[in-house]
Amino acid sequence: MPKLKTKSAVKKRFKLTASGKVIASQAGKKHFMRRRTKAQIRNLRGTTILCPQDRYNIKKYFLPYGIN
């Protein structure tokens, strides 16, 4: 049986930590930034850890070898 391929889009958007958590960048920073306050823009920097249900879905359906 051939190896399962990882979805390319998921490879670019998410990373797995050593403990099995999924890291993603904050959503909502592409456009419409003028209407946001400086604090809102600042809080969108960096990355966030996905909630357990989203983590499960990403690992199960898109990262075939990501489930520990």
UniProtKB/Swiss-Prot annotation:
It comes from the Bacteria. Keywords: Ribonucleoprotein, Ribosomal protein. It holds the Pfam family Ribosomal_L35p. The keyword Zinc does not apply. GO terms for biological process: translation. GO terms for cellular component: cytosolic large ribosomal subunit. GO terms for molecular function: structural constituent of ribosome. The keyword Lipoprotein does not apply. InterPro entries: Ribosomal_bL35 (IPR001706), Ribosomal_bL35-like (IPR021137), Ribosomal_bL35_CS (IPR018265), Ribosomal_bL35_sf (IPR037229). HAMAP family: Ribosomal_bL35. Belongs to the bacterial ribosomal protein bL35 family. This is Large ribosomal subunit protein bL35. The gene is rpmI.
